[in-house]
């Protein structure tokens, strides 16, 4: 019962739905019971949500279910980029293709409010030529529709790590801090287009 690209089927004791905006929501059957039994802990709330309001909990993840009930994660809601054409793109999609090439150790797709996407790249090996890097980007782009292709890229001068504050301890990119650190280079990247 596996399907390539999916995280599997939803466990039998859980109910999942996809909201109108694509967010995965989990039905918490235990929440009304929890609220009843923790009234003292929640007494400072100005209003206690009804059980109907509490049952569906947003996860912050975007995803979809296929016809056979397999769940696919498409990215994090807070990471969605909206291009100047109004296209919503989960950056994790092109990032996963870039990382899958083996040429890149890290990739962060940028382009919120822009006509085209770009990427900040950390190569897996030092000294790769621009031609090799572009070939990796081109290869990833072949699997993407035009609106999600990487049209511009730049190399980061160091990996994104907890030591420099650009990643969490478990390796998640701190996107806002990375954008801030590379703001001048990103502006130049888009100024030349």
Task: Briefly describe each language-model feature range.
Residues 156-182:
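Flexible lysine-rich "adenylation lid" loop at the C-terminal edge of ANL adenylation domains
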Residues 1-2, 105:
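Gly/Ser/Thr-rich phosphate-binding loop
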Residues 10, 17-83, 100:
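Conserved ATP-binding/catalytic segment of the ANL
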Residues 18, 62-152, 159, 164:
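AMP-binding/adenylate-forming catalytic core of the ANL superfamily
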Residues 7-10, 54-55, 155-158, 182:
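Short loop/turn motifs at secondary-structure junctions and domain boundaries
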């Amino acid at each position: 019962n596996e399907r390539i690209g999916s995280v599997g089927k939803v466990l039998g004791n859980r109910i999942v739905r996809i909201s109108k905006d694509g967010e995965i929501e989990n039905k918490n059957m235990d929440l009304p019971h929890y609220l009843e039994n923790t009234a003292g802990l929640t007494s400072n709330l100005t209003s206690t949500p009804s059980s109907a309001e509490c049952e569906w909990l947003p996860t912050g993840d975007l995803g979809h279910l296929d016809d056979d009930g397999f769940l696919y994660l498409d990215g994090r809601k807070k990471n969605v980029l909206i291009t100047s054409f109004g296209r919503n793109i989960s950056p994790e999609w092109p990032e996963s293709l870039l990382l899958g090439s083996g040429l890149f150790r890290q990739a962060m797709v940028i382009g919120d409010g822009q006509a085209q996407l770009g990427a900040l790249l950390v190569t897996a090996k030092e000294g790769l030529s621009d031609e090799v890097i572009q070939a990796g980007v081109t290869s990833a782009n072949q699997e993407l529709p035009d609106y999600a292709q990487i049209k511009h890229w730049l190399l980061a001068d160091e990996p994104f790590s907890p030591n420099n504050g650009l990643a969490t301890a478990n390796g998640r990119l701190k996107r806002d801090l990375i954008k801030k650190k590379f703001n001048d280079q990103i502006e130049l990247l888009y100024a030349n287009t």
